[in-house]
Amino acid sequence: MKRKPAVAGYFYPERKDELYSLLSSFAIPEQHVSGTIIGAVVPHAGIIYSGRTAMYSYRAIEKSAVRDFVIIGPNHRPLTPYASLYPEGEWSTPLGDALINDRMAEALYRDSNYIVKDEESHLMEHSVEVQIPFLQYLFGDGFRFVPVILGDQEIDVARDIGEAIMKIEDPFIFIASSDFTHYEDAKRVEKKDMDLISAILTLDLDKFYSVLEKENVTACGYGAIAALMYYTKKRGGRMIFLNHSNSGDVTGDYSEVVGYASLVSVIP
């Protein structure tokens, strides 16, 4: 099955030349990190707003030889309370078609207690789709991916998915798709986001969920981030913070913004 783009013309340009030009405009220098990259946290808002921050992670990933990606984001319109996997086929964007790694998808489905095969939930969801043009920009059609969106983002689900991902045998990079605090003034957004980023860097899931609750951090993909934290800790790795920004940096209006962050996960 070929999935058509749901948010082309809304979250990113629907014309190939305009999309490529937008991605090219993010003049982010090469990101040198110590260690082997196994994961990243990236935003998924309109690319004009969050793309520059996202590109920090992708510029770090660019140096890796790995070309398989497990991309997990939130389901903003959950039809099921589960983790929904799109198990096979292709996804189209204005830059071309991206192929799902169906063997890796099947392994993830087999080893998780929460993941279900559910193409329908993906049809209008943008949290995974917005990542595909970045990968196409960097790697053309030379990559494959596994898309998962979470209707339930609680800690038990994050641990389960982290465990299932641990069992994948082939090399891959885990991309956790999430925006951070939504629709508050820029100073409050920066404070909340940096507190959550500090918790992410500890790889302590209990602390992470505590900060989310106590500070009311409205990071929409927190379950994906938590799964990446769990996986990173199990692999003996660490998280590295690369960049933070907010939508006001583009609009000029800092009274009500959305926060974005890029981090990468590395092992020695």
From Swiss-Prot:
InterPro entries: MEMO1_fam. Pfam families: Memo (PF01875). Belongs to the MEMO1 family. NCBIfam families: AmmeMemoSam_B, PRK00782.1. This is MEMO1 family protein Ta0237.
